[in-house]
């Protein structure tokens, strides 16, 4: 507990059955991001790990490989535990189809949802839409400026919440009170559209990791779905954002990260906060 394992999360034998209260993660993108390179996707810091789920040759293999992790998440989740998965729509260039269009949309959220609901006993609890309020200036032009084949700008992502069946554990009254949300937080966090900017240069991982999760996403999920001293897991730790926020909210954390090159930035993030320092934010 309160550690990071630098290995694949396909087998999380370090974690006992039914011991994790909340899982928050964003899985590797399919054939879009190279996690063996820096945040600018220029300098390579290591070879591509053979267990990198984002490097599979077909989309079907990618979704199947992710399911192995989701089944492990189901195993380690406590009764009434939540699994929060953040993914975007993924525009892909068509290279192998003889069509008039040169791109296709991979609806990763839908594919993962179907895979989980068909192959596990988890239930779909909620779906939030992350509206990236300061999206990239890299525009998708399509047939611009002429009609018929405009491409929508990719400015949203999804946070899908699954729940494991069962009664929640008994939580002492003082812990429940200390973990409570303000009325303002409750009203804001339960809206299905979350207006949150993407991370900028103020994030310690900027330029070091190519897919940084904004701290506000795990902050809201942790406040909504866990109490102080609960265990929060991220099976695709990346730059360590989820773990940092969990620590600052007085939760325990466990992370799995395939690329050890990210150890330094993960340690920097974890060392930049004190346990429970955000509990006085409300």
Language model: regions and residue ranges:
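Short, conserved SAM-binding/catalytic segment
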Residues: 248, 267-281
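Core catalytic lobe of class I
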Residues: 1-265
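Short, flexible loop/turn segments with low-complexity composition
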Residues: 173-177, 277-282
């Amino acid at each position: 507990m309160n550690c990071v394992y630098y290995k694949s999360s396909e087998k999380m034998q370090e974690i006992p059955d039914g011991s994790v209260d909340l899982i928050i993660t964003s899985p590797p993108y399919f054939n879009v991001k190279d996690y063996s390179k820096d945040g600018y996707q220029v300098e390579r810091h290591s070879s591509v790990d053979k267990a990198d789920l984002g490097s599979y040759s077909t989309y079907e293999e990618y979704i199947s490989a992710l399911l192995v992790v989701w089944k492990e998440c189901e195993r380690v989740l406590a009764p009434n535990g939540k699994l929060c998965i953040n993914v975007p729509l993924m525009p892909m260039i068509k290279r192998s189809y003889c069509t008039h269009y040169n791109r296709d949309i991979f609806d990763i959220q839908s594919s993962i949802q179907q895979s989980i609901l068909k192959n596990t006993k988890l239930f779909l609890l909620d779906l939030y839409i992350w509206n990236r309020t300061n999206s990239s200036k890299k525009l998708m032009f399509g047939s611009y400026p002429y009609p018929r084949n405009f491409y929508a700008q990719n400015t949203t992502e999804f946070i899908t919440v699954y729940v494991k069946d069962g009664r929640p554990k008994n939580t002492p009254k003082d812990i429940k009170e200390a973990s409570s949300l303000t009325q303002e937080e409750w009203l804001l966090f339960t809206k299905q559209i979350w207006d949150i900017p993407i991370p900028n240069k103020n994030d310690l991982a900027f330029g070091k990791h190519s897919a940084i999760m904004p701290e506000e996403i795990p902050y809201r999920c942790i406040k909504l779905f866990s109490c102080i001293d609960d265990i929060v897991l991220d099976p695709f730790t990346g730059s360590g954002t989820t773990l940092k926020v969990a620590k600052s909210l007085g939760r325990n954390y466990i992370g799995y990260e395939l690329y050890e090159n990210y150890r330094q930035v993960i340690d920097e993030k974890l060392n930049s906060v004190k346990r429970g320092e955000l509990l006085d934010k409300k």
